[in-house]
Amino acid sequence: TSSYNPQNQWTNSYGAIQYINLFLEHVGGVKWSDDEELNKLFAQRLTGEAYGLRGMFYFYLLRAHAGFGANGELLGVPIFTEPQTIESDFNQPRASFQACVEQIYNDLSEAEKRLPYEYEDVSGSVPSDFQSLTQDVGKYNTVMGAKARQLYNGIIARAFRTRTAVLAASPFFEDASNAATWADAANAAAAVIDYKGGLSGLASDGVEYYSPTIINTIKDGANPNEILWRGNKGSGDNDQESQNFPPSLYGNGYMNPSQNLVDIFPMANGYPINDAASGYDANNPYAGRDPRLGKYIFYNGSTISEKSITININEGNQDGVNVTENRSTRTGYYMRKRLRMDVNCNPASISKQPHYTPRIRYTEMYLNYAEAANEAWGPKNANGRDYSAYDVIKAIRKRAGIGGTNDAYLEACAASKDKMRELIRNERRLELCFEGFRFWDLRRWKADLNEPVYGISWNGNSYQKITVEERSYEDYMYCCPIPNSEILKYSNLIQNKGWK
């Protein structure tokens, strides 16, 4: 209901925007340093960060609450660019979807022109965009150098421009009032990819960006090659593992991947498992599969060399289906992605390891480009660039170790925009699984929300597909509601169609 929405962004995002608007009102009057050049540099960076963060929070609001109102119009959210006071008129209508997109772009542009792509120390001379503020390399590095790593920067702003453009061009938001195009979305993603170095910038170790080797060698706020923006690297914990390890590893098994997800991982030869050319064996369902399956999901027979253990979902086994309430899998699978196998949750010998949260991966940017470019120009039309949608998907699949020297299934898909769309969406689903994208992707694509959730059971001799949960969604649920408490308070707010 509109009174209970776990995806609600209204309170937190508008609260953040209020603080940002207050900051922007006062930033010019604050003395950040006794040195005039440092003062100007700090003011520019902090102003740029504030604009970028405001654009980010408006993106979260738009993604969560935009939709077709009860009046039939495609609506966004109310826009506030100045701080509200007790004398402000809070009874503001929702701006159009188009106006919200433009506001996000404007904020991101203000960030982009004030911030470097990344915060790194320079030698020699100050970058040309900042020479009007200082010619002193030391002063530039004090404010815009490596000490500011992981703060909001220019490439983060461009990544949110890409996310906004893909959202706005998506099928759910098609409307005469919406000027977004897939070409705009492709160009926005290409700006990030070009900065990364084109196809050659796709991180070779991006499939397991969370591996102990990568995490343990992160230093001083730097990013792994796959990561555009991340959270801090902690000193050590086992929270994710304790929550998601199977019971045999002393975990609580919270996240249970569905059979639906497992089935979309192709065979190592690149063919889907339902293709006659795949070689898939239902009696040995995990043999010869896409290597990402074993890296992202614990399945029956998964081995963990660090712990000398094999996952066994046989009926009655502690890792079996529904053996222990709230701990055992409901689907026959457990999540493995982002978990460290060198963590021990055994109460007798607990060990912890550092982790970090990936806020934005470069692979997402490549997938955004592939989706948008295919829709705008088709699978193989690069529109003047060195890479097409086809080229990006080929590189991602090759990195994963599927398709061999001749990815015949990819080549077949490249002859059709519709087939390539299906393949791109499939690659997006498995590459970004467990990272918070699927919920939003299904809605912006207007995809089927009522597919039953399937799992698998194993009796020691054969596998049996099981129905875990039936889904019941109405069409109006493609968008999330405006909080009912806000609708009751403000007469100018229009609820999204269908929500009560």
What are these regions (language model features)?
Residues 1-67, 85-121, 287, 336-358, ...:
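Conserved, well-structured interaction surfaces
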